């Protein structure tokens, strides 16, 4: 799977935009607040060793309410609307998504790539006048239709990937996706044809598949991430694209707040770590340094099969050697 994803060039990225800079300390301070009678000055003067201790204690006791005070805002770019629909099901979060009605930026990238490939002089931005816009849309439609009809599989893929996420299993067929990539291009051609004939964008978009790329800004807190999002979405049971996103996000968060996210992972890892006196890093499970003791994971995978299942889950975005120990 990892090789096919790399070959596909998914074009999906996760970028951390903002976060609670001293989030680890704030989690520890909030944990002390719930138990200590000390004044605020003493609580805020917590040392690094105490930060480590309080984070560990809240994790072991599954007392995650203090973790809600560490918040993360990130942008996912290039994901499909299939994946974005799964993402927004996580309700303890805030979302702002690229408008499907007012923006056709990803589609235009594909159209311009098609224009370039066939040597058609197309405007990079349609003119402001109605006639100018319709003329540009006609050219986009013609270029995309020709690409769908006349180009080989690799050329079609290079154009379609600008606007659509193409599943690796489809690419692995070796026949250009058995007409799928061609269908993507034809849908984009029809979309621009409709616009050139005066259709509204809000209506023309009905022809487009859910594979269309989008962009979304998400804000979540550490508790939602470690208790809900990562256990569900880093697991092999998750659909491959959102699993890819979850592992990319985990890598980003592990860099800025390793003491909070080193024990995070799919549901098998979260369960194992909450059973242990001392939790272990996700990397140590991946490398087989630590072994699972649970008879089966929450997804009913038997004990002996859990390590392989975890490695399969990580194959969409594996960490480097020694990363996040």
From Swiss-Prot:
Is Nucleotide-binding included in the keywords of this UniProt record? no
Pfam family name, one = Thy1
Matching entries from Gene3D superfamilies are given as: 3.30.1360.170
Free-text cofactor note: Binds 4 FAD per tetramer. Each FAD binding site is formed by three monomers.
Question: Any idea which positions bind dUMP?
Answer: 86-89, 97-101, 205, 233
Q: Which domain of life is it from?
A: Archaea
First-tier enzyme category under EC: transferase
Q: Where is the ThyX domain?
A: 12-267
Q: Which InterPro entries match?
A: Thymidylate_synthase_ThyX, Thymidylate_synthase_ThyX_sf
Q: In which pathway does it act?
A: Pyrimidine metabolism; dTTP biosynthesis
Its needed co-factors are: FAD
Q: Where does FAD bind?
A: 65, 89-91, 97, 221-223
Q: Molecular function terms in GO for this entry? A: flavin adenine dinucleotide binding; NADPH binding; thymidylate synthase (FAD) activity; thymidylate synthase activity
Q: Which CDD domains match?
A: ThyX
Task: Give EC number(s), comma-separated.
Answer: 2.1.1.148
One biological process GO term for this chain? Answer: dTMP biosynthetic process
| Record has NADP as a keyword | yes
Q: Which reaction does it catalyse?
A: dUMP + (6R)-5,10-methylene-5,6,7,8-tetrahydrofolate + NADPH + H(+) = dTMP + (6S)-5,6,7,8-tetrahydrofolate + NADP(+)
Listed under subunit, the entry gives: Homotetramer.
| Job of this protein | Catalyzes the reductive methylation of 2'-deoxyuridine-5'-monophosphate (dUMP) to 2'-deoxythymidine-5'-monophosphate (dTMP) while utilizing 5,10-methylenetetrahydrofolate (mTHF) as the methyl donor, and NADPH and FADH(2) as the reductant.
Protein name per its UniProtKB record: Flavin-dependent thymidylate synthase
Give the source species: Aeropyrum pernix (strain ATCC 700893 / DSM 11879 / JCM 9820 / NBRC 100138 / K1)
């Amino acid at each position: 799977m990892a090789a096919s994803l790399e070959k596909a060039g998914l074009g999906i990225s996760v970028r951390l935009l903002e976060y609670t800079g001293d989030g680890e300390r704030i989690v520890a301070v909030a944990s002390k607040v719930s138990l200590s009678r000390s004044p605020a000055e003493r609580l805020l003067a917590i040392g690094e060793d105490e930060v480590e201790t309080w984070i560990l204690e809240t994790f072991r006791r599954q007392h995650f309410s203090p973790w809600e005070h560490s918040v993360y805002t990130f942008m996912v770019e290039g994901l499909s609307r299939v994946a974005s629909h799964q993402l927004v099901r996580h309700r303890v979060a805030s979302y702002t998504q690229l408008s499907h009605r007012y923006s056709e930026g990803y589609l235009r990238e594909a159209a311009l790539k098609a224009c370039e490939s066939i040597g058609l002089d197309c405007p990079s931005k349609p003119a402001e006048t109605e006639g100018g816009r319709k003329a540009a849309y006609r050219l986009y439609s013609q270029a995309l239709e020709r690409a769908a009809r006349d180009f080989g599989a690799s050329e079609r893929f290079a154009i379609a990937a600008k606007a659509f996420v193409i599943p690796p299993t489809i690419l692995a067929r070796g026949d250009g996706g058995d007409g799928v990539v061609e269908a993507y291009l034809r849908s984009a051609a029809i979309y621009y044809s409709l616009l050139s004939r005066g259709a509204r964008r809000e209506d023309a978009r009905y022809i487009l598949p859910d594979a269309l790329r989008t962009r979304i800004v998400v804000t979540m807190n550490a508790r939602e991430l470690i208790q809900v999002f990562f256990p569900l979405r880093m697991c092999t049971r998750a659909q491959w694209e959102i699993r890819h996103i979850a592992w990319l996000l985990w890598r980003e968060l592990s860099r800025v707040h390793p003491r909070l996210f080193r024990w995070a992972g799919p549901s098998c890892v979260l369960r194992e770590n909450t059973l242990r006196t001392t939790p272990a890093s996700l990397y140590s499970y991946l490398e087989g340094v630590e072994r699972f003791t649970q008879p089966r994971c929450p997804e009913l995978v038997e004990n002996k099969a859990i390590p392989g299942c975890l490695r399969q889950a990580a194959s969409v975005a594996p960490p480097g050697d020694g990363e996040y120990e």
